Amino acid sequence: KILTPQESYQSINWQVIILISALIPVGIVIQKTGTAGWIAGLISSATESVPFEWQPKVLLALIYFITIFLTEISSNAATAIIMTPISIAVAQQMGFDPRAFVFAVAFAASASFITPVGYQTNLMVYGPGGYKFSDYIRVGFPLAFIFWIMAIFILPILWPI
């Protein structure tokens, strides 16, 4: 069945559209005020003792970890909008190609498996499915960990850093 224009208009989730639209200025402010650069400096300084050849992967792992942590307590759109300028600033400060870092943010923000809070669908099945918070941690943490490890090794192959 093909949707009519009216049906397609009615199926739009306006709350998500409004949330993303409202958060885009937050991402711009983070970038324009220098906050992204400041946070990027903190993140980059965490890898000063790491050998240079490992710094790109360690930074990528750190960006992914921070993003996945935030996406578990916030919406994935909000997390991506906040972390994207920070990840770009980290890459630029270190002289790396930012594409792998941006994709790390995109993948991590979309991998909300550890809590029912981070993603709407998780919340929808949480109550009716009779799940406990610990069920999400038990199943979601190993899955998120596997995604994290895969991202650290695959993203630099696709977008060399």
Question: What kind of feature is each model-predicted range?
Answer:
Residues 1, 21-27, 60-70, 88, ...:
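Hydrophobic core segments of alpha-helical transmembrane domains in multi-pass membrane transport
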Residues 5, 98-99, 133:
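Alpha-helix N-cap/start motif
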Residues 9-38, 57-69:
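Core transmembrane alpha-helical segments of multi-pass membrane transporters/permeases
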Residues 29-37, 69-82, 111-120:
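Short helix-coil transition sites and intra-membrane helix breaks within transmembrane domains
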Residues 38-42, 78-90, 102, 119-130, ...:
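Re-entrant/interfacial helical elements at transmembrane boundaries that shape
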Residues 38-56:
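Membrane-interface interhelical connector segments
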Residues 50-90, 94, 102, 106:
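Hydrophobic alpha-helical transmembrane segments of multi-pass integral membrane proteins
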Residues 94, 106-161:
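Juxtamembrane and boundary regions of transmembrane helices in multi-pass small-molecule transporters
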